Amino acid sequence: MKKIFLEYLNELIYMLKEYENSWWAEWMEKAYIKYRDENDIDKFLRAFGGMGSFSDSIFKNDCTDLIKTITSNMGYEINKNGYTDVYEILDRIVKYDISWIKECTENNRDISYYQENEKRLAFFSYLLENYVPGNLHEINTAYLEQSQNKSR
């Protein structure tokens, strides 16, 4: 599972460099090295605490935030349990988004309440269906291209 967390963290770093022009990329690179070399998750988790933290970041590319969501969940599970399962995390997020969309539609809420969740659900479902260890960058890139083509 260490390899999978590092793959997701590496993809997050790529997204930060490629789409966000964010100084957080450097922080995450240091966290990557710290975890890879020393199994120390603390540098990564410290990015999420307090005002102005990585949690508060607003990204230009929606997929950056979605990869951040998965990676942060993995980091917290590693810290708590010593391991993580990306498929369980994706499944949990998909179930949450489905229940939120269902609740919104049953209560006749405006589409704006759940429109973002529909996008999240599409991305997380795509990962759940297509991800195998080692192919994250490839399928994320394909998803980004597909999304950009739809918006044109």
Positions of predicted regions on the chain:
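Residue-level recognition of alpha-helical structural elements
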Residues: 1, 5, 17, 24, ...
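Short terminal alpha-helical segments
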Residues: 1-31, 120-149
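Alpha-helical interaction segments
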Residues: 13-17, 44, 89-90
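Secondary-structure edge/capping motif, primarily at the C-terminal ends of alpha-helices
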Residues: 16-19, 35-39, 104, 108
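Amphipathic, interaction-prone secondary-structure segments
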Residues: 24-59
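Amphipathic alpha-helical binding modules
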Residues: 49-152
